[in-house]
Each structure stands twice: as C-alpha cells, then as structure tokens.
Amino acid sequence: IEFYKRFESCELVSEVEEMEKEMTDRFGEPPAEVRVLVALEKIRALASALEIDEILEDSRGVRIRISGNSRVDPKKIVALLKKDRRISLDPTDNEMVLFKPAEKGDEKKLLELKKWLQQIS
C-alpha cells in the first residue's frame, strides 16, 4: 500500500520509473499485475503533463479526450492520423481521438498507448 500511495503522488514519468526501480531493487522482478499498475501510472503522468482530459477504453479501442486547453501538438495528431490507421477521430465528438492498439494483453496495450502519447507530446 505504501508504494501505491507513492505512485499516486508521482507527477512525472521519471518519478514513476524511479519508484519502479526502487521496488524492483527491494522485492525483485514484479508480477504482471504490478507491471500493469506501473504502466498505468506512467500513462497517467504523461496524460497529466499533456493536460489530456480523459482516457477511456471501450469495445472500439482507447478513447482519448483532448480539449483545446491541452498541451498536445495538433500537427502531430494530424500527421499520425495520415500515417497510422489505428488512429481516428470520433465523428460524434471533435475532442475525442480513438486509438486501436494492435497488441493484445493489458501490458502490451499500455506500452503501445504510452508510446503514442509520447509521439503527440
């Protein structure tokens, strides 16, 4: 529980990575559930830094709400829309980007989402 609370207080990906290293040093290689938690915390920190409003997963993929106040570079999203078929705009909501991870499994999908968020920053 101590680590969970500390993860929640991390604001930067580098802080999450430091905690991940500390946890691995103390307890050894973490199980899959902990790796998923760490991946989620990295995504939360990235999304917070970019001022992304929300990230949701549903049957269509990962939905990312990017309002005009965010720090996301719109030109990067447009460029990714042109070259990556996994990314589309929600026709019913002009602030929502739909991302369809190619990978299956929570850990792999989260890694893919993290890489995508880094590309739009």
Q: Each PLM stretch: what is its role?
A:
Residues 1-121:
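Accessory helical-bundle/CTD segments and flexible terminal tails appended to RecA-like ATPase motors
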